[in-house]
């Protein structure tokens, strides 16, 4: 079978989510042929792995803590032209590649092109419209996002929604699946072996901001605060220099989940894929949503009983030290709450089965 993936190029989370689904499909369909249409981060991520077609996408102007709605629209004022150009590009690709199904992650042009050519489509996205509680804070930005998501939910043959803490279920053509993660913790080596191989004598605090610059102020604050704690910190995927001996700064590496498995706790932004892996691996987390990013506000609303939530805008050395000291006292409580979430199988396994069922109809 042939599978065309149309994936947003914003951030790493969508890349890792779809790669996990692709790997499951390749295990189940040995003759599968994969093609990906994408841009930005995802294009660089997949360029040595699968055949690619370049499309255009939204541009986000990274700042230290927040998404500026005005700057996003200024940067993307001509996106409507890119949107229709993308549809044309994807339609040509569909006619040439002739996929059995089009799988789309957060890029509505893929659904529009598939519908125009009467191709089966599956939309994968974590926006649960039953849990949107922040409309009044985002204005036209929210309107644009919700219109796009509703269009895809309406016109796709099936919709796959990976959960965080919601109950996996089926509602019509919407399939709520387990969190989609890169690899199941049971498939990794045990913590003792990993700690020995990675060179740690005690479980570290893992810091990750997902490859964006939005959390750089947080990272710099942690670098300043680390010397006050008898903890080992790993700052993952950011090119910075440590200011104390208890901080290790690592570039982006493919074995992130090994570091996650041995970690004592995690400090992170509120990206869906990162939170999915944190919850699946049963780790206490101190979470900072990117200001004005609707998706991350939805995410923290879903996990607020299972992690400590704070605010990037208010971060300072003193406020972080107070917050982190309090967090350390509650790590056992948050770990206990994450263990109440009974995930058994990786959501990518479920998603691949749903896609294959749609293809076989």
Name these PLM-found stretches.
Residues 101-106, 123, 255-298:
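A donor-sugar binding/catalytic signature common to diverse glycosyltransferases
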Residues 15-26, 41-42:
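Short amphipathic alpha-helix
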Residues 5-9, 27-28, 32-83, 315:
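Conserved nucleotide-sugar phosphate-binding/catalytic loop shared by glycosyltransferases and other
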Residues 69-101, 108-109:
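Conserved nucleotide-sugar donor-binding subdomain of glycosyltransferases
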Residues 22-24, 182, 188-265:
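Donor-nucleotide binding loops and adjacent catalytic segments primarily
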Residues 310, 315-343, 361:
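Conserved donor-nucleotide binding/catalytic region of nucleotide-linked donor-dependent transferases
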Residues 7-19, 213-216:
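A short, glycine/small-residue-rich beta-strand->loop->alpha-helix junction that serves as a flexible
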Residues 139-204, 208-213:
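A nucleotide-sugar donor-handling region in carbohydrate enzymes
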